[in-house]
Design a protein with these regions (language model features):
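Positively charged n-region of N-terminal signal peptides that target proteins for export
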Residues: 1-5
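Bacterial N-terminal signal peptides
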Residues: 7-17
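Alpha/beta-hydrolase superfamily serine-hydrolase fold, recognizing
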Residues: 22-36, 42-70, 92-351
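Phosphate-/polyanion-interacting regions in eukaryotic proteins
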Residues: 64-85
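An N-cap/entry alpha-helix motif that binds or orients negatively charged groups
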Residues: 80-98
Length: 351
């Protein structure tokens, strides 16, 4: 079985800082259009001056990465290697303690800050990692910084993965962990967050909890996600996971992505695609994306749906950076993004 080297919602591997190779510019900027409105675009996009020098160097380094084809086993091996490296980096920047355990029969990591105010001891955040639903790209990479900055315990959930376990297996696992935590925590003292696949799961879990009549958590963190598996947002036709660099493959209604996760579920099922669910009464939500994020459009569309349902939903869009850039701790923009995430939970959870 072959899949793309960087499937949708996978983490971006950290690359060394390299000078971008000089290539000849296209003869001229142009755009032509088919009768149905399909655009064929050639553009010259200079390195943005509106981001930090560190981010400029990082964007340049992404042009040196090579894609290609990988088997699922190869992808998981590569992602595991990245996760180990990224977790070590996370601890350097944001020290925290990590304990491996199980919760409701599901493997979890308990991440605790080195110091925790007494007022925060009743709070807990559930982290749902990214990785394209078929691997773990960021369990500790996501959970460690938030535990450190929010001075709050984080439970990172190793939910079952596709293709072996398609939807709704991952949702079932997270709900089981949430119900277990309800035995020791009030729902108002629990928050749920995730990046990419984990962001999608966060919204799906909230819908499941509402449909099941369970108490909802205090807050949701949806960091580069989507709410609709039946359609493709505009940014997915413009960007790869690295922004501009990388292989682009056209997506249309006949070859929608993520079949292995979706399985036999109707793509418009509200439990799978929260955009079709009743979102009234959903918890306060923070959504974070960036202007070269492959899921920029999908994140913005979900944000609008939450607003239309009267939800306290905030959208933060960072300039010129690609998908899940906050996995890369050398960037000042990452520090800002993580601090905003932690501040949001500090305001909403257990208060």
């Amino acid at each position: 079985m072959k899949i793309t080297a960087f499937p949708l919602f996978a983490a971006i591997a950290l690359a060394p800082t390299l000078a971008a190779q000089s290539n000849p510019a296209p003869p001229q900027d142009s755009a032509t259009f088919d009768p149905d409105g399909t655009a064929h675009i050639m553009r010259t996009v200079p390195m943005p001056t509106t981001i930090s020098p560190e981010a400029q160097n990082w964007l340049a380094s992404l042009t040196q990465q090579k894609g290609g084809q990988q088997t699922l086993a190869e992808r998981r091996a590569r992602t595991d290697e990245w996760r180990k490296f990224g977790s070590g980096e996370a601890r350097k920047y944001y020290p925290a303690n990590v304990e491996e355990t199980t919760t409701a029969g599901v493997r979890t990591d308990i991440i605790t800050p080195l110091t925790m105010p007494e007022a925060n001891r009743n709070r807990v955040l559930i982290n749902l990692h990214g990785g394209g639903f078929n691997s773990d790209s960021g369990s500790l990479i996501e959970g460690i910084p938030i535990a450190n900055l929010a001075k709050t315990k984080v439970v990172s959930v190793y939910y079952r993965l596709a293709p072996e376990n398609p939807f709704p297996a991952a949702v079932d696992d997270v709900v089981a962990v949430y119900k277990e935590l309800l035995k020791t925590h009030k729902p108002g003292s629990i928050g749920i967050f995730g990046t990419s696949a984990g962001a999608i799961l966060t919204a799906e879990v909230a819908v499941r909890l509402k449909q099941s009549g369970l108490p909802l958590p205090a807050a949701l963190g949806i960091f580069s996600g989507l709410g609709d598996f039946s359609r493709v947002g505009d940014s997915r036709q413009l960007f790869t996971l690295n922004g501009f660099p990388g292989e682009m493959r056209p997506i249309d209604s006949k070859n929608l992505p993520d079949d292995q996760y979706v399985g036999k579920t109707d793509r418009k099922d509200p439990a799978l695609s929260p955009l079709f669910a009743d979102l009234h009464g959903m918890p306060p939500s923070l959504l974070v994306t960036s202007t070269r994020d492959i899921l920029l459009s999908d994140t913005a569309t979900l944000h609008r749906a939450l607003l239309q349902a009267g939800v306290d939903a905030r959208l933060v869009v960072f300039e010129a950076l690609p998908h899940a850039f906050w996995y890369h701790f050398q960037l000042p923009e990452t520090k800002e993004a993580l601090e905003q995430m932690a501040k949001f939970f500090d305001e909403k959870v257990g208060r």
